[in-house]
Amino acid sequence: MGRVGIICLIMLVQGCADGADLPPLEDARELVVLTRNTPTTYYFDGDRASGFDYALTRQFAQQHNMKLRIKVAFSLPELFSMLENGEGHVAVAGLSQSPGRDARFAASIPYLHQQALVVYKSGESRPRSLSDLMARDLVVVAGSAHVEMLTHLQASLPELTWREVHAADSLEVMQLVSEGLAELTIVDSVEFDIQQRLFPRLVAALELGNTTPVVWYLPKDAASEPALDKVNRFLAAAKQSGDLAHLERLHFGQFEHASRLGSLTFQRKMRSELPQWQSLMAQVAREYQMDWRLLAAMAYQESHWDPSATSHTGVRGMMMLTQVTAEELGVDDRTDAGESLRGGARFFKDLLRRLPADIAQPDRTSMALAAYTIGMGHLEDARVLTEKSGGDPHLWPDVRAHLPKLQNPDIFPMTRFGFAEGNQAVTYVDNIRHYEGILTLESLPTSRLSPPIEVDALLPEHLRGTPLPVL
């Protein structure tokens, strides 16, 4: 490496060693958040930053007129080391509150609660009690609160052992169990509920301990009290206003009707059938300004990606259109995949447009999906029933709870449009959202951030392990 290259490398190293002089949170114009690159916290969906914790911290920054800067740690020990070294104002990464962490850092009020779950692979020996964890190959994420839990349990169960996987997250330890490279792991319920869609053979065997609060952690120093107060006021207001619940729905959703068998079948089809249709779906989705994964999930729910599918009721094609609907949408050949996808996308976008303007996402898409399968009139009946029962007709979870009433013989005769398969509509929407979630998660491993290069290894031998001069 030439002298110019070494100088550039030195500048790069020094550029990364920032954070020691961060202004206090209450005075800062930029919020520096330390987090992890995981599906439940922070990730890139294409070129767009996303994730529940990212969205929550962005909301904090916007409310306080601050810029947001994200710094990613590649392990939990590194995350807390960065916080201890003053490299960020807060650590926000789905962090369970624990005595060990509380001794080192200041914890906010909880913004979620989660349960530690012992996870195994279906078909293998299921652990039914804590004693069943002994003499098993148990893996956990290094630096996690689960290590603290196990260390505490080891006092009464001295034969309990485990392996700690470094620079990993729950997705990776779940993959180890799924691939038979470990027997058991421990994963928090929030992450398990989302990530099980990628590993449908994995099952929660038992709960470990009580539910634990999920908190933001701040440095424990003289400046932490006003900063902690600022964070706590924000989190309390987000709970009270419903903003927190809205973000939970947006990022975690509801998947009550999704079966493990359905997930396995979907994943097999995703590998065998989807590749031949993906580019066409992406093109149609671009034409109609949709996410291709939503369109693909709809097409799978309708026909399992079979362009020649036909039902006993006469609906046909990839999007299972009726003859009447196809004619209204200008679809000449329902068995032509491109025509069918365009017809379905056009119909869905029209339903999305016709919904009241004050229905926000993600509820808007879920309601349009329900209308796609039972009709806008029946959806409106369910919204009216929701409002009459004291629910919010703008929120999908509330409307979802009332859709089955359209089958109740004591209720549907009094609605404007009468009987409808409300239970079927609920399952339809849940399945599509579930399949869309799998497609989203499948795209994440290729877009996850890579750990930093070990710069020391690139330096000439006489410069390794020595402080670099300031230029």
Identify the residue ranges that each predicted region occupies:
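Extended ligand-binding regions for polar small-molecule ligands
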Residues: A17, G51-Q63, S122-H146, S189-D193, ...
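Substrate-binding/active-site groove segments that recognize
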Residues: A142, S308-D332, A337-D350, N408, ...
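Extracytoplasmic small-molecule ligand-binding "clamshell" domains
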Residues: D18-L95, P99, A103, R163-A167
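Export/targeting segments at the very N-terminus of extracytoplasmic proteins
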Residues: F255-W305, G338, L355-I359, L444
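Periplasmic-binding protein-like
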Residues: T35-T38, P110-G123, S189, D193-R233, ...
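A ligand-binding cleft/hinge motif common to bilobed small-molecule-binding domains
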Residues: V92-R104, T151-H152, Q175-N210, E380-D381, ...
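Catalytic and substrate-binding regions of cell-wall glycan-acting enzymes that process beta-1,4-linked
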Residues: M367-I438
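Bilobed "Venus flytrap"/periplasmic-binding protein-like clamshell domains
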Residues: V32-T41, D45-Q62, S96, L117-D169, ...
